[in-house]
Amino acid sequence: MADILLLDNIDSFTYNLADQLRSNGHNVVIYRNHIPAQTLIERLATMSNPVLMLSPGPGVPSEAGCMPELLTRLSGKLPIIGICLGHQAIVEAYGGYVGQAGEILHGKASSIEHDGQAMFAGLTNPLPVARYHSLVGSNIPAGLTINAHFNGMVMAVRHDADRICGFQFHPESILTTQGARLLEQTLAWAQRKLEPTNTLQ
């Protein structure tokens, strides 16, 4: 079971994601991205083995409220999982580029190829997933491992040492056929090195 602070980037998918996580027994608290980063860091410090999850949302990562500041201040200090806009924010935070994907997707099912490692272990390959995006990450820096792609576009990244990962697609969507398992394996991967104490306290 994980204690998850879910940052809501003002997106209806946030609540689908929260429902999926809660149905698997995780504790989830939701805060919108207009809350000051310091307030959320203080809230995370009260949680037992916290995980920060960054939701999908409209627009570009740099304009998503406190999300860029949270990544700057918390990367490497606790596990962070980003979805869609959250994934793009992770790419930017590590020095990558986020630009137009060349098409606007809203509920498009695509079969992505993945490396079969870590959170993708044992999953169907190619894996059918749901894509809702017009932007995509590129020029991925050396610190991030590209662990899934579709037609040359980056669909997932991870940073093993910092316990940070991002998915361009939506694991919580019914169109992502093994999304619930992927989320569970991602949380297990993210928490693998956590000690019983909270390093933010």
Curated annotation (Swiss-Prot):
The active site is at residues 84, 170, 172. Residues 3-196 form the Glutamine amidotransferase type-1 domain. Its EC number is 4.1.3.27, 2.4.2.18. L-glutamine binds at residues 57-59, 88, 134-135. The keyword Transferase applies. One of its GO terms (molecular function) is anthranilate phosphoribosyltransferase activity. Pathway: Amino-acid biosynthesis; L-tryptophan biosynthesis; L-tryptophan from chorismate: step 1/5; Amino-acid biosynthesis; L-tryptophan biosynthesis; L-tryptophan from chorismate: step 2/5. The keyword Magnesium does not apply. SUPFAM superfamilies: Class I glutamine amidotransferase-like. GO terms for cellular component: cytosol. GO terms for biological process: L-tryptophan biosynthetic process; phenazine biosynthetic process. Keywords: Amino-acid biosynthesis, Aromatic amino acid biosynthesis, Glutamine amidotransferase, Lyase, Multifunctional enzyme, Transferase, Tryptophan biosynthesis. It catalyses: chorismate + L-glutamine = anthranilate + pyruvate + L-glutamate + H(+); N-(5-phospho-beta-D-ribosyl)anthranilate + diphosphate = 5-phospho-alpha-D-ribose 1-diphosphate + anthranilate. Component I catalyzes the formation of anthranilate using ammonia rather than glutamine, whereas component II provides glutamine amidotransferase activity. In E.coli and certain other bacteria, component II is larger and its C-terminal two thirds has anthranilate phosphoribosyltransferase activity. Tetramer of two components I and two components II. This is Anthranilate synthase component II. It comes from Shigella dysenteriae. The gene is trpG-TRPD.
